[in-house]
Every structure is written in structure tokens, then in C-alpha cells.
Amino acid sequence: MEGVDYKNFDAVVGKLRTFFRDVKGYKEVHTQNKLSILAACEDPQTIATYNYNGEVWPLPQTGQMWLEHYLLEHPDEKGFFCLSTSYRNEPNPVEGRHDKIFPMFEFELKGGIDELRKVEMELLDYLGFNKEGETMTYPQDDYDNVAAKYGVDELDHIHEEYMERDFGKAFFLEHFPLKTSPFWNMRLLDDKIHANKIDVIIHGIETIGSAERSIDKEQMKEMFNTISEGAYANTLFAQFGKERVQKELDAFLKKDFFQRSGGGIGMTRMIRAMKLSNLI
């Protein structure tokens, strides 16, 4: 039935807004009305499009790059957040895990991966996921270590389910290798083959996806053109024209960058997680 879970949606959004606005001091902005190619496309293989004012645009998948724009243009602010709708035309959706259209709560902040991890642990504490009497004590490990534990090269949704069994209800999976195709603006470690990325796995499902952003313009340009063996850039060029895409990329890379991070929270997944933990 339509709207059957509206009370839980209202409760969880209210808690997230209170944490980021009142506890952390971030500002809420609206990103859904922005026209963009790069800021909309996180996974070009799942893009759906619409025609507006004589041009083809992607239905937005994320508002995080727009939050970056806000933070880069207003560096006096502590951070920004938004409530958005993500359109993911998943070719092979997994029942119970993938919605093709779903609400997201997204945020951007000043600081690197350590600050990002701290804020996310504070958020989980605020929502009530911490063990009684404990704070900021969530298990964490690098992607490669966890993949080795399960005897695979790449982790998938089955392994996320194992993580709840092996590490508990909330687990921080960090430092993703380039073979997992992290977004092109993520900061790389010194080894240049891992990204400063954190997925927060709650009750066996990635519920928060986040990363530190790059400040290296040449690295971002190279990553844009080579990620997924060039398939990311070529898919965008084919759908929207190389000139339009390149113009957006060049405009973004002209900005004055500083250390920053951000992430997105899948609302249906967070509601699920809070239900399973009896928090709503």
C-alpha cells in the first residue's frame, strides 16, 4: 500500500535532519532541481534519461556533487546536506536490496576520511546503534582484508550479509581498491590503487556509502577518463555528447579544492536497519 511506512520515514528523516543541522551545524540545501550530467551520474550503466528544454539529461542518481559545489563555494560553512531522489535503472535488481527509485539523505563536510569516519560513528551513536554504555566503538577493516577473509577478489551482497554475522550489526568497510570502480573524484591513498572510501554495512546491507574527495585535479581528470577501463567516460560521451560532458568537467576542475568528504544514506535501508535494531 502506498505510503504505508510514512511514519517511519518521517521519524528517520527527522532524526537525520536534527543530527546534521542541530548537532553538527550543517545547512540544508535543495539539489534535485539542478541540471547536470556529472553531478547526476554515479553509475552510468544504470542511467535513465529525460528530455527537458530540448536537451537530454540523466535522471539524478546523487546530489553529492552539488553538495560539493555548495561547500567549495561557501568554505565558511561546516557542511551541507540534502534529501534527494535517486533513479537507478538497475538491470539485475536483487529482491529486497535494490529499488530502482529511492530516497536518499546526503551530506558533505570539511575534513578527510578520519573526520568522515568520526561523523558517521557519531551519527550511529545518535541514532542508537551503539552498545549500551559504549560510544564510537564500531568495528572496521580494509576491503582487501575482508575480501581475503572470504576468499574472493571482490565483495558482493552475500559477503555483506556475512559481515553482520562476523562483525556485528554495524561495520565500517574501508579503503576500496580501484578494481571496484570508485567514483572518479575520490581521494586515492599514496599507493594510488586504493580510494579513501567507507561503506557502512548495517544489518548486512550497505546503508551509508561515503568517501573523502580528491584535491588533485590531474588525478581526478585521469580517473574520470580511465575508471572502469574508460567505460564510465565513454558511456557519458555516447549519451550526452563529449563536448557537454567535457565542459562540465572542466568547470568543476577550475574550483579551488580543499580537504572534504561526503556520503549518501539510503533511506529505505536506514529505515530497515533501525527497525531491525528496534530503534523505531
Predicted regions and their residues:
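TRNA-binding/sensing appendages of the translation machinery
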Residues: 1-47
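Cytochrome P450
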Residues: 2-11, 110-115, 135-136
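Short, hydrophobic/aromatic alpha-helical segments in well-folded domains
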Residues: 15-16, 119, 248
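Residue-level detector of short coil/turn "hinge" positions at structural boundaries
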Residues: 27-28, 131, 259
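A translation/RNA-centric and nucleic-acid-associated enzymatic feature enriched
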Residues: 45-110, 114, 140-280
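Short amphipathic C-terminal alpha-helix that caps PH/PH-like domains
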Residues: 117-128
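Flexible helix-coil linker/hinge segments at domain or subdomain boundaries
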Residues: 127-137
